Amino acid sequence: ACEMCISKKTIYKYFSNKDILIEESIQMVHKEIHETIDKIVAKNFNAIEENFEIKRTFREMFKSAESSPIYQLKKHYPEVYAKALSSQIEICEKCFRDNIQKGINEGLYRENLDVDNYIKFYYTLIFNINENTASGIEAEELEVKALEYHIRAMATLAGIIELEKHLNNPII
């Protein structure tokens, strides 16, 4: 309430209890994430460029890890965080699946991929980095390495060339 410069009384005028407030907040964050991904996909980048653009955008959205809603949720409401994480995994799985299919269609990713396992590998890497890394800078570096690892594992020669182009761009 302090950070938003409104009183708790005002907040509870609109939300009958803290659980409902938290649930509504989570839904709002999920909606924002979904809309952000949709906007990036609508720009029609190639699959690899799309991955880097999503990475860049989310870095900006959550650049202050300690003030991010996800960090606060994990710290103060671990049960609600676990539920929110499960929902977020579903959103990410669809995003990853669509991106892999797009990359295959563009000839940037190999055709004979075990898509389900590649999705599981990548989100396991990303979520574990964020769960187990204390430093935001270290997490950022590991996320870029995980993205590189993920793309290299799937890429054709054309995909590797596109990947190298983005890795050599310092604005990841």
Regions found by a protein language model. Name each.
Residues 1-20, 24:
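Helix-turn-helix
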Residues 8, 13, 69, 95-96, ...:
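Gram-positive cell-envelope targeting signals
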Residues 24, 35-65, 119-122:
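Hydrophobic alpha-helical connector segments
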Residues 56-61, 70-73, 148-154:
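Helix-loop "lid/cap" segments that line or gate small-molecule binding pockets
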Residues 63-108:
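Short secondary-structure transition hinges
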Residues 91-120, 125, 129, 133:
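Hydrophobic alpha-helical bundle segments that form small-molecule/ligand-binding pockets
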Residues 98, 102, 106, 135-172:
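C-terminal peripheral helix-coil segments that are non-catalytic and often amphipathic
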